[in-house]
Amino acid sequence: MSNENKVLKLGLPKGSLQDSTIDLFAQAGFHFSVQSRSYFPSIDDDELEAILIRAQEMAHYVELGAFDVGLTGKDWIIETDADVVEVADLVYSKASMRPVRWVLCVPESSSIQSVKDLEGKHIATEVVNITKKYLAQHGVNASVEFSWGATEVKPPDLADAIVEVTETGTSLRANKLRIIDTLLESNTKLIANRQSWEDPWKREKIENMAMLLLGAINAHGKVGLKMNAPKASLEKLMSIIPALRQPTISALADAEWVALEVIVTEKIVRKLIPELKRAGAEGIFEYNINKLID
């Protein structure tokens, strides 16, 4: 088959990760258009076909070969015991660029203080297998029931405790729940079907995708700064710039001046630019970075 006819089947997570995933792909250079009620986004790449599916099911379908590649959480790979290639760690979630946690929670008023106190108790969760393994590791015999959602409202009437995912802890606190322990820290992963990974064309396509997605994540919260400065001010400027890497210094037509370019975290720029100006920099301008590839 010629490369012109080859297509990589991509599974995108539907639900809480959908918007942040579409945004991440856009920053990486892949632009999806998702129509209302449609599970088949269009994309500006003729070599890709995408389908939206729940992250909980993604690893299973990638293992079966329904998708060549997909995005899901480390948690769901473990929960479904899927045999897939873990291509890249993509540390982002619904509302932030950090991992999520699966935590054991009880009502604030509960007398339960540790996992040992759950002997003979009832636990509700979406991650039944992860929870059962955790209890077994602690030698605790408790009932674990699958929860179809709204897990946080189940204690104390419908469950003694829950195992629930949290990003910030805000929802747990709002429901007056107290965290006893963390079972698992999880982040999004790019995964591939093992047979697809052995196909040279598909593997290169997947590896290129991984590189661009990681570059987009690495660029998060960072900007570039360019400026001109007299050589006499260079030492002082270098002491001010908190660079992720050494600044790039280029010669200018005027032998007494140089151009500097540097990547910094965006949150410090409002303080940094006035300091650079006072130290002798001129023509300072800031630009956004879509991808930062090591």
From Swiss-Prot:
Catalytic reaction(s) noted: 1-(5-phospho-beta-D-ribosyl)-ATP + diphosphate = 5-phospho-alpha-D-ribose 1-diphosphate + ATP
Chain coiled-coil ranges: none
UniProt GO cellular component terms: cytoplasm
Main location (coarse class): cytoplasm
Gene Ontology BP terms: L-histidine biosynthetic process
Domain of life: Bacteria
Keywords, in A-Z order: Amino-acid biosynthesis, ATP-binding, Cytoplasm, Glycosyltransferase, Histidine biosynthesis, Magnesium, Metal-binding, Nucleotide-binding, Transferase
The EC number(s) this enzyme carries: 2.4.2.17
Cofactors named for this entry: Mg(2+)
Family matches, as NCBIfam families: hisG, HisG_C-term
Function statement: Catalyzes the condensation of ATP and 5-phosphoribose 1-diphosphate to form N'-(5'-phosphoribosyl)-ATP (PR-ATP). Has a crucial role in the pathway because the rate of histidine biosynthesis seems to be controlled primarily by regulation of HisG enzymatic activity.
Family recorded in the similarity comment: Belongs to the ATP phosphoribosyltransferase family. Long subfamily.
Protein name: ATP phosphoribosyltransferase
Species this chain originates from: Chlorobium chlorochromatii (strain CaD3)
